[in-house]
C-alpha cells in the first residue's frame, strides 16, 4: 500500500481487525469485498459506521480492513474499534467525542470456558431426585 494512511487495530471477542483509512469518497472494503457484501446483516454495517457517523466523516475516508477470527458480530465490533483508533490517529481531538460514545474502550468480554463435569460453562447436568 502506497500513500498516506492512518492505522488502527481493533479487537472484539476473538476477532482482530487491521484498519487503514485515507481521505477519499467513503468506500469501505473488508477483506477485499465491499462492506455491504462482506457483512450479510444490516447490523454489521450499522456497527462499523457508528464512529464515522458520530464524527461526521461518513463520506470523508476510504477505509481498507483486514479482519480475521471470530464471527460476524465480533468482526463488526473489531472493525468499529479499529476505525475508532484510526480516526484518533488521524485527529486526536476526536478522542473525547468517541470516548463518550464508548467506542475507544475495548470490550473485554470473552467466552467463558467450559468446566469439567458441567454441560457448558455454567450449565450443570439435570438433577433427578429419584
UniProtKB/Swiss-Prot annotation:
Q: Does the keyword Ribosomal protein apply?
A: yes
GO MF term set: RNA binding; structural constituent of ribosome
Q: Which GO terms describe its biological process?
A: translation
- One cellular component (GO) term of this entry: cytosolic small ribosomal subunit
Q: Signal peptide location in the record?
A: none
Q: Does the keyword Ligase apply?
A: no
Q: Which UniProt keywords apply?
A: Ribonucleoprotein, Ribosomal protein
Q: Which InterPro entries match?
A: Ribosomal_Su5_D2-typ_SF, Ribosomal_uS9, Ribosomal_uS9_bac/plastid, Ribosomal_uS9_CS, Ribsml_uS5_D2-typ_fold_subgr
Family stated for the protein in its record: Belongs to the universal ribosomal protein uS9 family.
The protein's name is: Small ribosomal subunit protein uS9
**What organism does the UniProt record list as the source?**
Janthinobacterium sp. (strain Marseille) (Minibacterium massiliensis)
Amino acid at each position: 500500500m502506497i500513500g498516506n494512511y492512518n492505522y488502527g487495530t481493533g479487537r472484539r471477542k476473538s476477532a482482530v481487525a487491521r484498519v487503514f483509512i485515507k481521505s477519499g469518497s467513503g468506500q469501505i472494503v473488508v477483506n477485499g469485498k465491499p462492506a455491504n457484501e462482506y457483512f450479510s446483516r444490516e447490523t454489521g454495517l450499522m456497527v462499523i459506521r457508528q464512529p464515522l457517523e458520530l464524527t461526521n466523516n461518513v463520506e470523508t475516508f476510504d477505509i481498507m480492513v483486514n479482519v480475521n477470527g471470530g464471527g460476524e458480530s465480533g468482526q463488526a465490533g473489531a472493525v468499529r474499534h479499529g476505525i475508532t483508533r484510526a480516526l484518533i490517529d488521524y485527529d486526536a481531538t476526536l478522542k473525547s467525542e468517541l470516548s463518550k460514545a464508548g467506542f475507544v474502550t475495548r470490550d473485554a468480554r470473552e467466552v467463558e470456558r467450559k468446566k469439567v463435569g458441567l454441560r457448558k460453562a455454567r450449565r450443570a447436568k439435570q438433577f433427578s431426585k429419584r
